[in-house]
Amino acid sequence: GDNHGIKIYDVDLEEGRLTEKAEVEITNSSYVTISHNGKFLYSITDFGVECFQIMPDGDLNFVNKASINGMRGCYLSTDYDDKFLFCAGYHDGKITVLRLNRETGAVGEITDEIYHRGLGSVAERSFRPHISCVKMTRDNKYLCAADLGIDYVNVYRLNQERGVLNQVDIIRCDLNSAPRHLKFSEDGKFLYIVGELKNCIDVYTYHEENGLPFFDLIQSIPTTNRYQMQGIAASALNISADGKYILASNAGENSVTLFEIDPEKGTLTRMFCLPISGEYPKDAALFPDNQHLVSLNHESDTMTFFKVDHDMKCIVMNQKEIKIKQANCIIFHLLQD
């Protein structure tokens, strides 16, 4: 979160706790992602992006860094073959595509740069493009780019050889909904988009027909107890390791909301929406066993921990909070043998 960079923790699944193991110094690491082969970690920095090899003991070994030729990014992801790295630009409304070395993980040259264009609805934050998330469809054909400034999710076909994007569709979200993050279901058939200002998750079906992507809205479900109330902003969106649950966090209300995913229909059923004993939950995630939950509270500089009672549909505070300065992002990673 702070200038000290990336903290590495050992995970105690039984107790639902984290123990600090190491710290990697890096300038303002605001978001990290792990390659789909599990070998490399990529981080946003003030300079651009940096790559680290994940060592057998979980430590990080610096590989290289690369410029994104623009203002600092806010979100990173890779395609499912780990051939390209995508960086979302909140401040300049730009998608940057960089080539990856699949053997070393090193970040290479920029293969494409696309600026979103358009106007939002109000003459404040939402009057120009702010790309907040970029994710590939699970069939590795299309890149979806959420833009909370103009209430669109732009869809691009990825040229797998050249790393070039070609726009083929637009998902038009509700006016002033501010699509912030998106996730695909484990089978790739459903898309979940959380609206920062709408405080709602929109569920879409996804399929390809005649070489084109199709997205159809099938559900909208609130993330908060007070639907569309001012002063509340949906922030994180994470799917559990087994794909059975989806978790959203809400700033302002300072709560987390857990939903169960219908494996056939893709629709969501809310289990609970409860406070996280901290301020501005920038990110939140279930432990890999789904029995515990952690919230990263950006404004109170804490991580808070909870036991998840699936029968009673509630969470219970689990021991003391951990102090951490301005935490932004958390990822659980199972070390490879």
Residue ranges, per PLM feature:
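Beta-rich, blade/repeat-based domains predominating
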Residues: 26-36, 69-80, 117-138, 173-188, ...
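Short loop/turn segments immediately following beta-strands, especially the blade-tip
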Residues: 9-15, 52-59, 97-108, 156-164, ...
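Asp-box/WD-like beta-propeller blade repeats and closely related beta-sheet repeat scaffolds
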Residues: 61-133
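Short loop/turn segments immediately following the C-termini of beta-strands
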Residues: 1, 46, 90, 100, ...
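Blade-loop segments of beta-propeller domains
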Residues: 20-82
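Blade-level signature of beta-propeller repeat domains, shared across WD40, Kelch, NHL, RCC1
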Residues: 298-304, 316-337
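A short beta-strand motif characteristic of beta-propeller blades
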Residues: 19-25, 61-67, 118-124, 166-172, ...
